[in-house]
Amino acid sequence: MKTTNKRTSGRAALAGALLAGLLAAPRAQAQTALGGAPAAAAPTGPWTLQGAIDYALAHNLNVRQSQLSAQNNKAVLTQSKAALLPTLNLNGTQTWNYGRNVNPLTYEYENQTIRSNNFSAQSQLVLFQGFQLRNTIKRNDLDYEASLRDIDKARNDLSLNVASAYLQLLLSEELIKSNQSRVASSQAQVARTQILLKAGSVAESNLLDSQSQLASDESNVITATNQRDIARLNLVQLLNLDGSAAATFRVDAPQLADPDAEAPYALDLNQTFETAANTLPEIKAAELRVQSARRGIDLARGGYYPRLSLFGSVVTGFSSSGTSRVLTGDSTATILPVYQYDPLNPGGTPTLTNFAVVGPTQANYKFLPAGFFDQIGDNVGRTVQFALTIPVLNGLQVRTNVQRALINEDVNRLRAEQARLTLRQSIEQAYVDARAAQQQYAAAKRQVEALTLSQRNAEIRFNNGLLNGTDYNIAKNNLTFAESNRIQAKYSFIFRRKVLDFYQGKPLSL
C-alpha cells in the first residue's frame, strides 16, 4: 500500500513538472492598466486563436508604447525638416521710466515719466552648415523607419506569446479529459472490486488498493485543473483582460492532428533563415539603425565645416516724449546789411553801405507730441547681416563627436550581427526541439499502445484474483504517465512547428 502511494505521488509530481515545463517559450509579463484606463471586458463566447491575437494586439500596452515611440520619432523627423526653413521671431516691449532718464529716441536726459515701446522682427536662415541639417533629416528618417519595425516586432512577439499561452491552455484541457477518463475507469474498478469482494473472489486489500488508486486519479484531476486555471489566467492577463474574466473565459478547441510518428520532420534551415532574415522586422530594424549610425558619422563630421548664416531684422519704437515739427506759416524776409572795405586800407574796418540784401524766407515751426503710429513709421530701422563662423579650436568637441559616432556605428553593426546570429540559433533550436518532440511523441505513442494492452491484461488478472492491487495500480499508473507524455509531446511539437512556420512567413493558425 505504501509503495503504491509513493510511486503514484512521485509520478504525479513528475507529470506536473513536465506540464509546467512544456512550451517554455518566453511569455510576456501580464499587462496592467496602472494609472491608465481599466482593462477591457472579455467578450462572450469561446475565443479562437486568431481572435485572441487580434484582441491582444489592440489592447497590449507594450504595443501601444512602441506606437508612441514611433510617433515621437516622426515628430522629431518633422522638426528636422522644418529646420531648413528660416526662423522668424517677433518681439515687443513696453517700458515706463520715472525720474531723470535717457529718452530712448533722443538719447537725452529728461526728468519726466517716459513710456516707450520697442518692436522688432528677426529672421535667420542657415545657408551652409556642413550638410548637417540634411544629414540630420536622413538620420531621423532612418530612426523613424526603425521604430516602425519595432512596432511589428512587438506585435510578432505578442502573437507568439498568445499562441504559446493558447496551446498551453489546450494542453491543460486535454490533460484534464485524460485524467477524468482515468477517474471514471477507477470508479468502475472500485465498483467491480466491491462486487468481487462480496462474492469472495478477491481479498479486502484489493478493494483498498482500488480505492487508493481512485483517490490518486482524483488528485491528478485536481492538479490538472489547477494547471488549467493557471494557464487560463496567464492567457487572460496576456490579453489585458480583467482577472475576474478568467472564471468564464473559454477557448475554441479545434481538433489538432497528431504528429506523424513515422516520417521525420524535415526543414531546410538555410532557406528558413534567409526567409526570416528578409521578413522579420527586428532584422530590418537593426540594419536601419546601422545606416542611421553612418549618417550620424556624416553629421558629426559636418562640425569641421564653416557655418554661414543670413540674418535680417526690422526694428522700430515709440516714446511718449517724442515730438514732431508742425509748420505754422512763413516769416518776413530777412534784411541783411552790406559792408564795404576801403581798398586803400585793406586792413581797416569795413564800413556800412547804403545797400541791403534780402535773405531767404524762413518757415516757422512748432513742436507737438508725435502720435504712436507716426513714430512707428518714422523710427523704422533695417539690418541685413551675413555671419560666417569658422571652427578652429573648440575643446576637441567635433573630433570627440566623430569618434563617438564611429563607435556608435560599430555598436549598431554588432547588434545587427547579433540579431542575425540569435535568429539563426533560434531557428536551429526550434528545429531540434521539434524533432525531439516528434520523436518523444512517437516513443510515447508506442509506449501507450503497449501499456494499454498490459493494463488490460493486468485488469483481467486483478479481477480474477491472480494479481494483487499494488501491481495492478503500477500498470495503470504507467499507462497514465505514458499518456500524459504523449499529450505533452504532441503540443510541444505543434508549437515548435508553428514557430518554424512563422519564421517561414506563414500566419499563426491552428
What are these regions (language model features)?
Residues 2-17, 29-42, 98, 243, ...:
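Acidic, low-complexity, intrinsically disordered peripheral segments
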Residues 34-45, 91-125, 255-264, 298, ...:
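Small/polar, glycine/serine/threonine/aspartate-rich low-complexity segments that form flexible
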Residues 82, 219-241, 437, 441, ...:
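Short segments within alpha-helical structural elements
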